[in-house]
Structures are given as structure tokens and as C-alpha cells.
């Protein structure tokens, strides 16, 4: 998150220094919606993510880009999202609040030139009161409109609006545990609730008779269907909509009562 209200540490406050630049790009302080801790290195991310974040922050500060003020709802730079996969694909989404076409294009080109390894470079103009982009237009500046992850020989498409586990390596172990708990014999009807891009649904499909996935975000369901087709999986069905509206008695009468339910906790 970009913010012009940088969170000062206790050490910085006690230093009696004057801080002329309060711009920050990092993570929100718990319980302080308008304060952001400036981050130089996140140890949970690949180093390329740190390089991109630091480069974008430096460029924006040097070229006079305004950082978002959540209270006043003003400023150009809003959020930065970086996603990478185990096969080396890299997605970067820059979210602007105020739009200045010249500055926007200059920044996007700077990112593209500085980090040619980015496989999907996207941007969004989000002038809403909240940071969600699921209802916003995602514009591809350079490269593909999605990235791909691989798991047990399966390939999964991950779009900018699609949820995928942030820790790809651990996600594989999580899915293994879910599959083992399900103890599938090949004859079961499985419901995968809040299926996202259908990664778990497709992951267990080879061990089940049929898998039905339900997800609120329509674009994620499109990815789920594409993932099944790409991996030649024919025993999955996916539906987009609100769970409380879709998963009713009529739905169960049509598709059958599940033997196993996998659900997002």
C-alpha cells in the first residue's frame, strides 16, 4: 500500500529527527487503517519482489508522484501487488487512484524496462472508497494477462482477480493434506466450496468421480474451467455466484448430495 502517512517506529520518534518525506510503500499497521510501515525488505518474498517495490517507491518519490491519502481520498499511487510462481512467472499490478496518463505510462514503462523478467504487467484505476479490484477493469500494459503455476503435472492459470495461495510451495502440501483427509476412492461426488481458480477441485479430480466447484468471483470460475480444459480434466463443473444463493436444495437435487465437501475455512 502507498500512503503519505508513514508509520514512524519508536526508535525514529525518539531520534528527534525531522521527517520531511512521509511517503511509504509497505504494509498497514494493525488497527491503524491510515498508517503504513515503509518496507525495504520482506523476508517472506522472493528478492525480486523487494527490488520491484523499492524501485517503484524510489521512482515515484524522485518524480513527484503523490502517495494515497486514505482520509482525504486523494493522491495518485494507491497499491502495488506482486505475485510470483514456482515456475518463474511474475505478475505486477499497479493500482492508481488519481489518473495522469503521462505519469502513469512513464512509471509503467520504467517498471517494464527495469524488470524485463515480469511476465504480466498490469494496472488499474481504482477511485472507489476501498482497495478491492474485483469489480474494476484490469488493463494489460505488457505481457500476458495471467500467470501460471504447476503442481503434480497440472498447470493452473492465475488471473489478477483470482485467489491463489500466496505460498506456492506450502500450497502443494496443503492440498495433499486435504486430498488425504478426503480419502477418495474414485466413486465420490465432491463439492469444492469457494473454489477460487479451481486448483483444489482439479487437484483431487483424478481421485473422484465428479467434482463441483462454487466461487463468488466470475473471473476465477472462468480460470477454473480453463484449468480443467488445459489439463484434460473432464469430471469437473464450476459455478459462479454467492454461495447462499447457489447451494440450495434445488442445486443438490440437480447435482446430487456430496460425499465429500472441501471448504475454505
Residue ranges of predicted features:
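Rossmann-like S-adenosyl-L-methionine
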Residues: 102-265
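SAM-dependent transferase fold signal centered on methyltransferase-like domains
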Residues: 1-139, 180-189, 253-262
Amino acid at each position: 500500500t502507498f500512503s503519505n502517512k508513514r508509520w514512524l517506529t519508536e526508535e525514529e520518534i525518539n531520534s528527534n529527527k525531522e521527517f520531511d518525506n512521509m511517503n511509504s510503500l509497505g504494509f498497514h499497521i494493525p488497527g491503524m487503517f491510515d498508517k503504513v510501515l515503509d518496507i525495504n525488505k520482506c523476508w517472506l518474498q522472493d528478492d525480486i519482489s523487494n527490488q520491484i517495490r523499492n524501485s517503484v517507491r524510489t521512482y515515484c518519490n524522485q518524480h513527484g508522484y503523490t502517495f494515497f491519502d486514505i482520509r482525504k481520498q486523494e493522491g495518485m499511487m494507491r497499491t502495488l501487488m506482486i505475485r510470483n510462481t514456482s515456475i518463474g512467472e511474475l505478475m505486477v499490478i499497479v493500482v492508481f487512484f488519481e489518473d495522469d496518463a503521462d505519469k502513469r505510462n512513464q512509471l509503467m514503462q520504467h517498471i517494464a524496462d527495469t524488470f524485463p523478467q515480469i511476465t504480466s504487467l498490469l494496472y488499474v484505476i481504482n477511485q472507489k472508497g476501498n482497495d478491492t479490484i474485483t469489480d474494476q477493469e484490469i488493463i494489460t500494459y505488457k505481457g500476458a494477462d495471467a500467470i501460471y503455476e504447476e503442481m503434480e503435472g497440472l498447470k493452473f492459470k492465475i488471473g489478477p482477480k483470482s485467489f491463489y495461495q500466496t505460498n506456492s510451495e506450502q500450497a502443494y502440501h496443503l492440498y495433499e493434506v486435504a486430498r488425504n483427509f478426503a480419502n477418495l476412492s474414485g466413486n465420490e461426488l465432491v463439492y469444492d466450496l469457494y473454489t477460487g481458480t479451481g486448483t483444489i477441485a482439479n487437484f483431487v479430480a483424478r481421485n473422484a468421480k465428479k467434482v463441483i466447484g462454487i466461487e463468488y468471483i466470475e473471473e476465477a470460475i472462468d480460470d477454473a474451467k480453463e484449468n480443467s480444459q488445459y489439463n484434460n480434466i473432464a469430471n469437473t463443473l464450476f459455478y459462479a455466484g454467492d454461495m447462499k444463493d447457489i447451494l440450495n436444495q434445488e442445486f443438490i437435487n440437480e447435482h446430487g448430495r456430496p460425499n465429500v465437501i472441501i471448504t475454505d475455512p
